[in-house]
Amino acid sequence: MIDCRYYQQNECRSCQWLEIPYSQQLAEKQHHLKQQLISINCDKAQWLAPFQSNEQCFRNKAKMLVSGSVERPILGILKNPNDPQSAIDLCDCPLYPARFSIIFSILKDFIGRAGLVPYNIAKQKGELKYILLTESIATGKLMLRFVLRTENKLPLIRRELPKLLEKLPHLEVVSVNLQPLHAAILEGEQEIFLTEQQFLPENFNSIPLFIRPQGFFQTNPKVAEGLYATAQQWVSELPIYNLWDLFCGVGGFGLHCAKALQEKWGKPIKLTGIEISSSAILAASHSAKILGLEHVNFQSLDAASVIENKNENKPDLVIVNPPRRGIGKELSEFLNQIQPHFILYSSCNAMTMGKDLQHLTCYKPLKIQLFDMFPQTSHYEVLVLLERKKIN
């Protein structure tokens, strides 16, 4: 069991399974996964052992609500959103890398020097709402984002930034995000970069990836790297020359698979990636360029748009990595119609995935593996390789 004083003192209960031995956590998650797939014929599928995570220090990102005063800021959570006195400082949270606590101390000093008055939710006054800190495991470089209510403090931030960069030489990307609304929203639409660099380089399995401020990126890099490597391994021996990566994010799945397939078959592989986030598409396109993948087309679109494009060449493989709601009945039926030979389904919600697999009536599961992306909680990711059923 992790030694966490916040949990022991009942200050933070985000890690709801902290008292459950890790081996039991994995067993319960595996049982839950099998229950979600009970209506699917998995008799001939290969069930691989769960991919384990480190139990602590596994997160690469900290999302810290800022409260307290400008002289004594508190970085962490509010147990009661309407009560500033309920603030809990989580700078020593054992889920973060050890050096984050030192960085937080430096950032508290910066908050005072720049006069960033913490936003008071009850009074609807103040400026600084959140601090978001992300680390690249490949380089050790950092991305720092200040979520502010207005632009009023930008001149002071710019004035103090050179001193902060001296204290934190690994700080590669710094930005201000404007979120003017009095609402439980983490970030707004406008991002103001304060450094020349606008993305944080990462590298999984020799695939360059780029973390952008408003793009989604997994928070458990060790398990994410294992997830991508497994996907790459599963498809690398299959006869695939044209693949779609739907909900592609920064391109992790598609780039891993396309690179392995191109090396395997010695010919260009066609990759089409679809993602609604334009910043993620920029990152994915940059990665493809570095890898020298020529027949790649990443587009900033809703994944459902592929249903309307009847002229697109039909793929051999479709990768889907949807949000928690799953891919839904309409997209499932579309995949049944175009019948790619294989579907690779990555899910963060086994319940909706189970429903989607019921709709994918033309497919049978070949391989299934759980990835423990979120230890100390009931959440997990799962990867399933599906093959088109043979017509008798």
UniProtKB/Swiss-Prot annotation:
<dbReference type="GO" id="GO:0070475">
    <property type="term" value="P:rRNA base methylation"/>
</dbReference>
<feature type="binding site">
    <location>
        <position position="93"/>
    </location>
    <ligand>
        <name>[4Fe-4S] cluster</name>
    </ligand>
</feature>
<feature type="binding site">
    <location>
        <position position="275"/>
    </location>
    <ligand>
        <name>S-adenosyl-L-methionine</name>
    </ligand>
</feature>
<keyword id="KW-0411">Iron-sulfur</keyword>
<feature type="binding site">
    <location>
        <position position="15"/>
    </location>
    <ligand>
        <name>[4Fe-4S] cluster</name>
    </ligand>
</feature>
<dbReference type="GO" id="GO:0051539">
    <property type="term" value="F:4 iron, 4 sulfur cluster binding"/>
</dbReference>
<feature type="binding site">
    <location>
        <position position="321"/>
    </location>
    <ligand>
        <name>S-adenosyl-L-methionine</name>
    </ligand>
</feature>
<feature type="binding site">
    <location>
        <position position="218"/>
    </location>
    <ligand>
        <name>S-adenosyl-L-methionine</name>
    </ligand>
</feature>
<dbReference type="InterPro" id="IPR029063">
    <property type="entry name" value="SAM-dependent_MTases_sf"/>
</dbReference>
<feature type="active site" description="Nucleophile">
    <location>
        <position position="348"/>
    </location>
</feature>
<feature type="binding site">
    <location>
        <position position="4"/>
    </location>
    <ligand>
        <name>[4Fe-4S] cluster</name>
    </ligand>
</feature>
<comment type="function">
    <text>Catalyzes the formation of 5-methyl-uridine at position 747 (m5U747) in 23S rRNA.</text>
</comment>
<feature type="binding site">
    <location>
        <position position="247"/>
    </location>
    <ligand>
        <name>S-adenosyl-L-methionine</name>
    </ligand>
</feature>
<keyword id="KW-0004">4Fe-4S</keyword>
<keyword id="KW-0698">rRNA processing</keyword>
<keyword id="KW-0408">Iron</keyword>
<dbReference type="InterPro" id="IPR030391">
    <property type="entry name" value="MeTrfase_TrmA_CS"/>
</dbReference>
<comment type="similarity">
    <text>Belongs to the class I-like SAM-binding methyltransferase superfamily. RNA M5U methyltransferase family. RlmC subfamily.</text>
</comment>
<feature type="binding site">
    <location>
        <position position="12"/>
    </location>
    <ligand>
        <name>[4Fe-4S] cluster</name>
    </ligand>
</feature>
<dbReference type="InterPro" id="IPR011825">
    <property type="entry name" value="23SrRNA_MeTrfase_RlmC"/>
</dbReference>
<dbReference type="InterPro" id="IPR010280">
    <property type="entry name" value="U5_MeTrfase_fam"/>
</dbReference>
<protein>
    <recommendedName>
        <fullName>23S rRNA (uracil(747)-C(5))-methyltransferase RlmC</fullName>
        <ecNumber>2.1.1.189</ecNumber>
    </recommendedName>
</protein>
<dbReference type="Pfam" id="PF05958">
    <property type="entry name" value="tRNA_U5-meth_tr"/>
</dbReference>
<keyword id="KW-0489">Methyltransferase</keyword>
<dbReference type="GO" id="GO:0005506">
    <property type="term" value="F:iron ion binding"/>
</dbReference>
<keyword id="KW-0479">Metal-binding</keyword>
<keyword id="KW-0949">S-adenosyl-L-methionine</keyword>
<dbReference type="InterPro" id="IPR030390">
    <property type="entry name" value="MeTrfase_TrmA_AS"/>
</dbReference>
<keyword id="KW-0808">Transferase</keyword>
<dbReference type="GO" id="GO:0070041">
    <property type="term" value="F:rRNA (uridine-C5-)-methyltransferase activity"/>
</dbReference>
